[in-house]
Amino acid sequence: RKIPDSMDFKAAAGFAMVYTTSYYALKQRAQLQPGETLLVLGASGGVGLAAVELGKLMGARVIAAASSDEKLDFVKHLNPDEVINYSVDELKEKVKMLTAGRGADVIYDPVGGDLFDQCCRCINWNGRLLVIGFTSGRIPEYKANLALLKGSSMVGVFLGRFRKEEPLEYENNFQQLLNMYDEGKLNPIVTKSFPMEDFVAAFNVFTERKVMGKVTLEIKAE
């Protein structure tokens, strides 16, 4: 796909995967509606930032959650309605407090592990729990009795399969995202760029879980 004239290479590197993943998750999988409460875990990462940004554009009340105040400060330029530091606050109780006990309507979870377990207990009636990934390292188990009691759904988000099975819908999503970018509604953020020869340092930023926004590798022209 040709990069639009309005988009530079760094923005393009931080655009396609994160925005198409988050848009597919919120639009097709969760069918997010205006006025619903969207909880985004890992909100300072690439897909998390995109989910916060798109959630606001879709008219949701967005709660951005991350593991440090530094990461939450980074997210605040997107104007989430509420923020949660889940290294300090218990996620389940904080979400319930912010939603008058109801819980979130849609939960965007790229983290998994213990946070997923808490999400199952702070989701609203008819809620949708989006499984994006497992950056915590632990693939959690879903308690079927909680789905029954809350009328909730666990919904998988696999962009590669979506692109293969529904290519026209994928392309339609991509074009809508490009239109949003051209209209100044989306702002892909690349916070660190490394020359290709420093790829180990770039990889360490990920393994140490210090990433905010996107990290790119630059290939010099011969």
Regions found by a protein language model. Name each.
Residues 114-185, 218-222:
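Glycine-rich phosphate-binding loop and adjacent beta-alpha segment
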Residues 90-101:
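Short amphipathic alpha-helix with an adjacent loop that forms part of the alpha/beta core around
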Residues 5-8, 31-37, 101-102:
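Short helix-loop-beta connector
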Residues 13-89:
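Mid-domain Rossmann-like dinucleotide-binding core that forms the NAD(H)/NADP(H) cofactor-binding site
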Residues 102-108, 127-128:
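Short SAM/SAH-binding signature in class I
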Residues 35, 80, 103-104, 186, ...:
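Local beta-strand N-terminus motif with an aromatic residue
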Residues 178, 183-192, 200-222:
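C-terminal capping/lid region of NAD(P)-dependent oxidoreductase domains
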